[in-house]
Design a protein with these regions (language model features):
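Active-site entrance/lid segments in N-terminal catalytic domains of soluble metabolic enzymes
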Residues: 1-165
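Conserved acidic functional residues
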Residues: 116, 170-171
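Residue-level detector of alpha-helix initiation sites
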Residues: 25, 172-173
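Conserved active-site-proximal phosphate/metal-binding subdomains
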Residues: 149-167, 173-323
């Protein structure tokens, strides 16, 4: 079954499946694998490590991929966007900030501007700035976000911004999520946590295994890991991660953590580097309860698309569990 719609047409892809540009996890090999499977892979530009980005673009080879940035961080080093645009990306995704300053350059380079939003107001502002595609992120998503559940927010944005295709993100890990998102007016999905547990993802193997073993209820929204990593995220954003001993110790005691940071930050970095995820963060969304293996990224795309197609053919009938 084909999924020809505005999204697939704009991005010249076969399947309406996008890789979330996860910082330090969505590298070139993962992005390329998703794109070669018929979706669109986005390299995680994150906080703007130029040397890392250069390496990962090289790792993508000749695959047609895009890149995503944390907008407020990109604003502090705008020249990084020029370096990415010189690579002729299929799309650039901006999240968590004002896209207006960057939209003209992205359009001039021939890339599509994808804006991730968490409110209807942000969606309208993004369209006014020139967004070609909106990603509506629900609170179920891993990493940073706000508080609105996806399936309440999604149709609101679809109704408010009919002039652009909308992509659903947050809590989606299989074809049931894709089928449900399409039913609510989205034209595709973006998945992060599901691809975090892909063979090509740059995450530590122990972190991937934690996702496989976790349930959706094992995640929590917090600022604990932003504080210990020294990332000054603007309010009211918080980050969803798997619960572990470190977050349990400091949740609700963020001021104490900040006061003791000099004594704690070094141990956190050491834990991250050695794969101790009782201390280091595993950034994951509530979809982890639907993830039970670590397959190649192409297999994930194929499963999601095939299961959604079975659901669409079956109408209201249930589909087998799993992707």
């Amino acid at each position: 079954m084909t999924y020809a719609n505005r999204l697939t047409g704009l991005l010249a892809i076969r399947h309406p499946v996008l890789l979330a540009p996860m910082d330090r996890v969505a590298g070139g090999a993962l992005a390329a694998a998703v794109s070669r499977a018929g979706g669109l892979g986005l390299i995680g530009g994150g906080y703007g490590d130029a040397a890392w980005l250069e390496r990962e673009w090289a790792a993508a080879g000749n695959a047609r991929v895009g890149c995503g940035f944390i907008t407020w961080s990109l604003a502090a080093q705008p020249a990084l966007l020029d370096r990415v645009l010189a690579r002729r990306p299929a799309a650039v995704m901006l999240s968590f900030g004002d896209p207006h300053p960057f939209a003209p350059a992205i359009a001039a380079a021939g890339a599509k501007l994808i804006c991730q939003v968490q409110t209807v107001e942000q969606a309208r502002e993004a369209v006014a700035a020139g967004a070609d595609i909106l990603v509506v992120q629900g609170t179920e998503a891993g990493g940073h976000g706000l508080t609105r559940p996806l399936f309440a927010l999604l149709p609101e944005v679809v109704d408010a911004c009919p002039q652009v295709p909308v992509v659903a993100a947050g809590g989606i890990a299989d074809g049931r999520g894709l089928a449900a998102a399409l039913a609510l007016g989205a034209e595709g999905v973006m998945m992060g946590t599901r691809f975090y547990a892909a063979q090509e993802a740059l995450a530590h193997p122990a972190a991937k295994q934690r996702i496989v073993e976790a349930r959706g209820a094992d995640t929590v929204r917090s600022t604990v890991f932003d504080i210990v990593r020294g990332h000054a995220w603007p309010a009211p954003y918080t980050g969803r991660v798997l619960r572990n001993a470190f977050v349990q110790r400091w949740l609700g005691r963020e001021d104490d953590l900040a006061r003791n940071l000099d004594a704690i930050a070094g141990d956190y970095v050491a834990a991250r580097d050695c794969g101790d995820f009782d201390i280091a963060a595993v950034v994951a969304g509530e979809a982890c309860g639907l993830i039970h293996d670590i397959p190649p990224a192409a297999e994930i795309v194929e499963r999601v698309v095939a299961q959604a197609a079975r659901l669409r053919r079956a109408g209201d009938g249930p589909a087998p569990a799993g992707a």
